[in-house]
Swiss-Prot record:
Annotated organism of origin: Novosphingobium aromaticivorans (strain ATCC 700278 / DSM 12444 / CCUG 56034 / CIP 105152 / NBRC 16084 / F199)
CDD domains with a match to the protein in the record: AmyAc_Glg_BE, E_set_GBE_prok_N
Family: Belongs to the glycosyl hydrolase 13 family. GlgB subfamily.
Sorted UniProt keywords: Carbohydrate metabolism, Glycogen biosynthesis, Glycogen metabolism, Glycosyltransferase, Transferase
Gene3D superfamilies to which the protein is assigned, alphabetical: Glycosidases (3.20.20.80), Golgi alpha-mannosidase II (2.60.40.1180), Immunoglobulins (2.60.40.10)
Domain of life according to the entry: Bacteria
Protein's name according to its UniProt entry: 1,4-alpha-glucan branching enzyme GlgB
First-tier enzyme category under EC: transferase
Length: 721
């Protein structure tokens, strides 16, 4: 039956909502026939993919529409076209059947599909005898979706997609295109308006900014050599392992030149040996996903599944992770499921409606960052995010995710005034949809990737952030492995900024943290957030003249490495960078020529080595049994001392003298009589100190030892018997 003229016009204009109903091979009253749009052709002959001639087509419309009878059943066809003495072949995408199946439809609709990154987006596959790319995108409210790219001159009329109405997914298999092809989606909204071209939410690769197209790409192909590393972390309890995290912005750790970026392979050659020599156990990268704006540091991503093109092809990141693992170093990435930017090529009003976000700005707009908040009440949005967490664990072997801005997800009134937010169904401020999403994400990654860990950046007193989220657990439990201890960071930095003479009045800024230190599995974070936006570097937060600043910083690091909790330090602070961090420039590595800065670097290196080699300092980081106060109330002298311990391990005493006053004969309570070896002293000359100490050891008798306490210093004493 010949379609009406209006349908043909719509087809040729690229506005027909169901091009598969008209194009390809169809059964007619006189047998099978083929219909194709072949712009520029004068003649066309249909062939099977196996090389069998099926029939000749005639041009029935001057705009390039061909029709003709063909032999055989419905099957993929290839057209041999001629015009002006030229010949070319076109494999007809509309002659192929769908790639997604009923099971995909069911799982996508249910929100339980845990392999979406194999199905959605662009995938190079072989389908019904042809090689090409399968495209699939979720746009349930769109009137029409087309793939446009450098393979079809960005012409929306060439490849309109098939709609799977039950799930709102549009798909098409386009034969004879390969990898590294730029593409976007042209979406016509429900109101008939044409939206800005959209990047693929599931794209595996993207163009280098300022270009914004997605790129067709194979999944990373790696001959992984990290089995031993992964087996180790799968077999242990991370809470009882040493974890010292070096937080890195990959674009500014070092730079090849002012405007450029090192590739992942170049970073691997430089960063991995440095981290290993420094004794850090983990590297945590600020977000590595594609993002358009450098000053966002990656936290406003438009390509959650695509490693940023700034650092070379995606395979380079996989090689970096593999190399780190072979060196015994774990790799964490910052992950941003809380919000996304308003760039027009991104997720904003993706199909002409508030699809990934909320329609109401009181729910869907983030006032702090001028970004949009994911709608965690939509199962498709939750699936998109949960699958992304699984994707990084599976495809790139990352060891964990540091989840950004969790507090902003948990509360509907976060950073909002009265009248700017909507209570939940119970009248409260909790965002229970976000809670359920975080639980689902943690269950998914912990359930399928042994040894994986998640860390929450959560700045409130929400209970149970790092408590299990199994069925029957308290509703508030989120299921994270760890939580950042923001209280420790705020209180201790406030204390260290005070003049030593005033610290006696603020003793609780150090002691109070132990009231809650074991309520969660904590990471102690000295992160990038503390050295930007006018806050100054950690060195410049310390009180006193230059000598005292360095002494204070060494003492502070000693306190932190001796304190219960895993450790995190932002790049540059391990050698006391003086300037604030900026993503636009490399760290000031030349500072290491100065003895004071090199001394700090050695101190951090040795802290890491002692921390990792002494179970007393890490095996009970998250349990109160691993901590005992020795001196808690000497506010007048601003001295603190505690014992770190673990079953079967030699205990370690940590002593902090937070004034410049030297104490030559300080009575230190110790639980075991005998020799205690001075394993670390921040005032040692090797670290830039004055060299005051205890000549390597002290002896405890009748429950105490008399020790020498250097000025503005931290000591660690290990019991030897």
């Amino acid at each position: 039956m010949k379609p009406p003229a209006s349908a043909i016009d719509a087809l040729l204009d690229g506005t027909h909502a169901d091009p598969f109903s008209l194009l390809g091979i169809h059964e007619g009253p006189d047998g099978a026939f083929a219909r194709a749009v072949l712009p520029g052709a004068e003649e066309a002959v249909a062939w099977s993919l196996s090389g069998k001639k099926l029939g000749k087509l005639s041009r029935v419309d001057g705009r390039g529409l061909f029709e003709g009878k063909v032999k055989g059943p419905r099957q993929p066809v290839r057209y041999a076209c001629k015009a002006d003495g030229h010949e070319w072949l076109v494999t007809d995408p509309y002659s192929f059947g769908p790639v997604l199946g009923p099971l995909d439809d069911f799982l996508i609709a249910e929100g339980t599909h845990l392999r979406l990154f194999d199905k959605m987006g662009a995938h190079l596959i072989e389908h019904e005898g042809a090689r090409g790319v399968h495209f699939a995108v979720w746009a349930p409210n769109a009137r029409l979706v087309s793939v446009v790219g450098d393979f079809n001159d960005w012409d929306h009329r060439r490849h309109p997609m098939r709609r799977r109405a039950d799930i709102g997914v549009w798909e098409i298999f386009i034969p004879d295109i390969g990898e590294h092809r730029a593409y976007k989606y042209r979406i016509v909204g429900h109101d008939g308006g044409v939206l800005p071209l959209k990047a693929d939410p599931y794209a595996l690769a993207a163009e280098f900014r300022p270009s914004t197209a997605s790129l067709t790409a194979h999944p990373v192909k790696m001959d992984w050599a990290d089995a031993a590393h992964r087996a180790h972390w799968a077999s242990v309890d991370a809470r009882r392992e040493p974890m010292s995290i070096y937080e890195v912005h990959p674009g500014s750790w070092q730079k090849p030149h002012e405007e450029g970026f090192h590739t992942w392979d170049e970073l691997a050659d430089r960063l991995i040996p440095y981290v290993a020599e420094m004794g850090f156990t983990h590297i945590e990268f600020l977000p590595v996903s594609e993002h358009p704006y450098d000053p966002s540091w990656g936290y406003q991503t438009t390509g959650l599944y695509a490693p940023s093109a700034r650092f070379g092809p995606p395979e380079g990141f996989a090689r970096f992770v593999d190399g780190a693992h072979r060196a015994g170093i774990s790799v964490l990435i910052d992950w941003v499921p809380a919000h996304f930017p308003t760039d027009e090529h991104g997720l904003v009003r993706f199909d002409g409606t508030a699809l990934y976000e909320h329609e109401d700005p009181r729910l869907g707009f983030h006032p702090d960052w001028n970004t949009l908040i994911y709608n965690f009440g939509r199962r498709e949005v939750v699936s998109f995010l949960v699958n992304n967490a699984l994707f990084w664990a599976e495809r790139y072997h990352v060891d964990g995710l540091r989840v950004d801005a969790v507090a902003s997800m948990l509360y509907r009134d976060y950073s909002r005034k009265a009248g700017e937010w909507i209570p939940n169904a119970e009248g409260g401020r909790e965002n229970w949809e976000a809670v359920e999403f975080l639980k689902a994400m943690n269950r998914a990654v912990y359930g399928s990737h042994a040894g994986f860990l998640t860390i929450a950046e959560e700045s409130t007193a929400w209970p149970g952030v790092s408590k299990p989220a199994f069925d029957g657990a308290p509703r508030e439990n989120l299921g994270f492995g760890f939580k950042w201890n923001m209280g420790f960071m705020h209180d201790t930095l406030k204390y260290m900024a005070r003049e030593p003479i005033h610290r006696r009045y603020h003793h609780d800024e150090i002691t109070f943290g132990l009231m809650y230190a074991f309520s969660e599995n904590f990471v102690l974070p000295l992160s990038h957030d503390e050295v930007v936006h006018g806050k100054g570097s950690l060195l410049n937060k310390m009180s006193g003249d230059d000598w005292q600043k360095f002494a204070n910083l060494r003492a502070y690091y000693g306190l932190m490495w001796g304190y219960p909790g895993k450790k995190l330090l932002f790049m540059g602070q391990e050698f006391a960078q003086r300037r604030e961090w900026s993503e636009a420039r490399a760290l000031d590595w030349d500072l290491l020529q100065a003895p004071a800065h090199e001394g700090i670097r050695r101190w951090v290196r040795d802290l890491n080595r002692v921390y990792a080699s002494r179970p007393a300092l890490h095996a009970r980081d998250c349990e109160p049994e691993g901590f005992e106060w020795l001196v808690v109330d000497d506010a007048e002298a601003s001295i603190f001392a505690w014992l770190r311990k673990a079953p079967g391990a030699r205990p370690v005493a940590v002593i902090c003298n937070m004034t410049p006053q030297v104490h030559d004969h300080y009575r230190l309570p110790l639980p075991l009589d005998g020799e205690w070896r001075e394993v670390l002293n921040s005032d040692a000359e090797d670290y830039g100190g004055s060299g005051i100490g205890n000549l390597g050891k002290v002896t405890a008798e009748q429950g105490a030892a008399f020790v020498v306490l250097p000025p503005l210093a931290t000591l660690m004493l290990e019991f030897e018997g």
